[in-house]
Amino acid sequence: MGENIRVSILLLSTFLVACGGGGSGDSNSDKPSKNDGKLPTDTETSQGKPLTEKLQETPEDTNTPSVGGTPAEKTETIPISTVSNKNHPTASIAGMNLISLERQACGLGGLSYDNDLEHLSVQHAQYIQHMFSNANVSSFNAHSQQPLVGLEKTTGINNPYYSGVNFKDRLIAANYPNSSYIAGENISHRTAYSSNGLSLSPDTHAIDMARGLLSAPYHMRTLVNPNMNSTGAGLVTYTPFEKDANTSKGYLFVTSIAGSMTTPKDIANKIITYPCAASTGVKTGLFNESPNPVQGTNRNLATDPIGHPVHIRLADANTIKVSNVKIIDVKRNINIPINMIDTDNDPHKGTSYQLPANEAFILPITDNLKSCEVGNRKGQNCGLYGNSDYQVSFDILINNKNLETRKFTFKTGPVNYS
């Protein structure tokens, strides 16, 4: 359909941003931020206690998931010109429904829809939409509503959708009734250009954007946190500044998620994973995330992606130690090398992104896989193979006392190329 998944003139690019909790990744200063032309990097994270206790912090990310890996059954195209520049409630619900179903499949509990969180999400999406519709914005903190130098007319309080400098401020300003609990904000910003003026529906984009959020470990942590139980989202579309409305469209998927500081009793003493045995259609590769999950390894995820990470958590444990990890491609009978992120091997130790001692990530290292199926990358590494089963097994030492073993198989969806 003339739509490509590359950061180039013909593209579909996605910018994912996650901020954990009422303590957002935004500065509280009212001074204008610099629009410096650099690519977005890590957000500054607040160490403050969001209303009651320190909340989970999550990152800013530049992952660009492919629509080719969408879990939606409906992939027919529609004219871009017919997509109105507005909020699309059915699309946002479709995206969050995907996340809720993924959680339920793994025994993590579903999400109930919250109108207050929806309002927060839609309003912030509209704030960003107003910026990108009316100016060239090269770099900014997507959680922040601070004024930007040179863009004062479309940012800060001059933006008609201004609702607070950071996520915590917006929760307080909205008198969100559950703001004393944990809360988080995740943002996926996608721009699509199609030479023939056709693209996927907002619903399909939202579902794929949700799937992309689940493929990035520092976003995944918040979205599959069993403590979270309420959500609201907005999927706002717009015509990018100075672009042709017949061939270009922007999509902003903003999600707010909240819950209790206490893990449900029926989950707290269980070893949980994502993906899990019931997971299908997961993304094959991770091409970018900030903070970088492979920091310090000299790996450029954009050219050398890794496979879909596996998250492990045991809420009731003080510590876990994961060992004897194996990931096997069932069809091809090959063993996938792995790296770990845990309390002993954490590239962001000492920062707000540090994993707690009762969580870990398995990172599949897919350098030897020729998983790309089409295009210029055909025969190269695109993470795990598409539409394939992967068996995961590991030992887990709990509180340095009890050793248990886990084994399950998950299935990937179509190959994603960025």
Sequence positions of predicted segments:
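Bacterial N-terminal signal peptides that target proteins for export
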Residues: 1-8
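Functional surface patches built around histidine and acidic residues
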Residues: 23-32, 36-42, 47-316, 320-329, ...
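Acidic, low-complexity Ser/Thr/Gly/Pro-rich repeat segments typical of extracellular/periplasmic
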Residues: 300-418
